[in-house]
């Protein structure tokens, strides 16, 4: 059982803090996004830190779990937090996230959905981005301003 699910048993839907990692996979100037099953919105592959993990281990695990991809290198680009990283899930769970954004490099594997967290996986260009989950929108705005997705 995940750490967050264990905590939720004790606090219900009350707001909680969570640290996690989000992984940018950029191929041919397009970014990989996933349509999330829990929110039915597009986001960036990633998830919560588990007990004993480093953030780069979280990035590697989440990338593999959600996309079946692996990367040799994970470059820490930025850490996001604050009011923009509050989220209320459809089930009522409230979360304040601290999110480490990584860029994955030297990627291998066959892109496919490997867990129940994603409904679709797709690469999008800067000018064709779908409506995004609120935290992903903040992150991608930062990514575009940095010139990482041209």
Where are these regions (language model features)?
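Nudix hydrolase/Nudix homology domain
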Residues: 40-42, 111-150
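Structural detector for helix-capping/boundary residues
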Residues: 47, 61, 74, 124-127
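A short coil-to-beta-strand element that immediately follows conserved catalytic motifs
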Residues: 70-80
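Acidic, metal-coordinating catalytic segment for phosphate/diphosphate chemistry
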Residues: 1-22, 93
């Amino acid at each position: 059982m995940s750490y967050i699910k264990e905590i939720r048993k004790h606090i219900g839907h009350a707001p909680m803090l969570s640290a996690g990692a989000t992984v940018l996979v950029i191929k041919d100037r397009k970014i990989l996004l996933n349509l999330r099953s829990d929110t039915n919105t597009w986001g960036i592959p990633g998830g919560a830190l588990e007990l004993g993990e480093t953030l780069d281990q979280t990035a590697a695990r989440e990338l593999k779990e959600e996309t079946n991809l692996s990367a040799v290198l994970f470059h820490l680009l930025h850490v996001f937090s604050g009011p923009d990283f509050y989220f209320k899930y459809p089930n009522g769970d409230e979360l304040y996230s601290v999110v480490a954004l990584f860029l994955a490099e030297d990627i291998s594997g066959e892109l496919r959905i490997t867990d129940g967290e994603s409904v679709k996986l797709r690469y999008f260009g800067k000018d064709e981005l779908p409506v995004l989950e609120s935290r992903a929108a903040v992150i991608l705005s930062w990514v575009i301003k940095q010139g990482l997705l041209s």
